[in-house]
Amino acid sequence: MSKLILAVNAGSSSLKFQLIKMPEEKLVTKGVIERIGLSDSIFTIHVNGEKLTDIRDIHNHEEAVNIMLDSFKEHEMIKDITDIQGTGHRVVHGGETFPKSVVVTDEVESQIEELSELAPLHNPANLMGIRAFRKLLPEIPHVAVFDTSFHQTMPEQAYLYSLPYHYYEDYGIRKYGFHGTSHKYVSRRAAQIVGRPIEDLRIISCHIGNGASIAAIDGGESIDTSMGFTPLAGVTMGTRSGNLDPALIPFIMEKTGKTADEVLEILNKESGLLGLTGTSSDLRDLTEEAKHGRQRSRVALDLFASKIHKYIGSYAARMHGVDVIVFTAGIGENSHIIRGKVLEGLEFMGVYWDPKKNESLHGEEGYINYPHSPVKVLVVPTDEEVMISRDVIKYGKLNDNTPKKEEFDTNESIEVN
């Protein structure tokens, strides 16, 4: 029997949502409420392929949820709010407390609040959404799905930093990793595409958007990932620096007179591709600039791809080989130029990719390797909301033994040719 699940991502002044029919994994509607708390809040919802926008006063998240539910009824997506049988909430940080998704209780709320010191900009906002939905829909399960949970299978040698050990014991300083819901979704889908059990596969997942992270997934479990204690670590990103020598922070402070917080702001918002080029963090802009001969843009693209390229080599060594490389997220799904730069030179480890196939894939699923390539290379559009909805069914105990799409797709594979 089909169930309607609401996947939610609450920000401090926004609420993104998707209403999904499960187990078919069919999108009913999606939308976003922006500028919550201001006089000109913006409510956007998709109805029958058309995007409808309304500007009104929305004072808080509870009011935003009520407006969203009323819109569902107005457009006959539901007859009553009881038609929604569960909600799933993206929560950025679960620390070591939450190695998997969990049904929200008062105790879970308190634990998420305690973890806010690890994600001060995100966890409190995520909680506002959870509390609004729990108040307005008290009879259904509300499941928290954490960006960090998927990476809790990393071994100590992957997540510990070479710092005094008591920093880990006392303050929880370690690598946590992020984008876990995306890495989990695309790795499962990759196994379906190649027609092999995920337990038998070594997968390198490249989530490349404005934020980017790489994950080594062995037998379906994350054993390492590029982001760290925060999403600032790892590869170069749109506005984030990625890894650098930590001694640069006091050096920059001394040279510029800036505080530590101000330097961190620069590393998060003024660095990466934006910092390198001085013009844009948008890869499309930089690709055009490079085509027209701008040297700094060309170097930035090469550097960006090189960092990802190195992680692939590192993670292949870590897993004693690789069976599948997956590209996902905005850049990974749409930029054949970056994919090509990343893959160039990996033939020595069995990666034989087809430039024509690579160039033809933009935002759609498929292979970009030659049929004879030992390592399969895939583009897989991510769908974190579907992954969240699956967890609502699983942890909210809503499964009435109707097979989920992931189960009846297990043997579906895509031909290489």
UniProtKB/Swiss-Prot annotation:
Gene Ontology CC: one annotated term: cytoplasm
Enzymatic reactions: acetate + ATP = acetyl phosphate + ADP
Transmembrane stretches, start-end: none
Enzyme class: transferase
Residues carrying the site annotation Transition state stabilizer: H179, R240
Record-listed substrate binding positions: R90
UniProtKB keywords: ATP-binding, Cytoplasm, Kinase, Magnesium, Metal-binding, Nucleotide-binding, Transferase
Pfam families registered for this protein in UniProt: Acetate_kinase
Task of the protein: Catalyzes the formation of acetyl phosphate from acetate and ATP. Can also catalyze the reverse reaction.
Family statement drawn from the similarity comment of this UniProt entry: Belongs to the acetokinase family.
HAMAP family in the cross-refs: Acetate_kinase (MF_00020)
NCBIfam families with a match to the protein in the record: ackA (TIGR00016)
Name of the protein in question: Acetate kinase
Organism this protein belongs to: Staphylococcus epidermidis (strain ATCC 35984 / DSM 28319 / BCRC 17069 / CCUG 31568 / BM 3577 / RP62A)
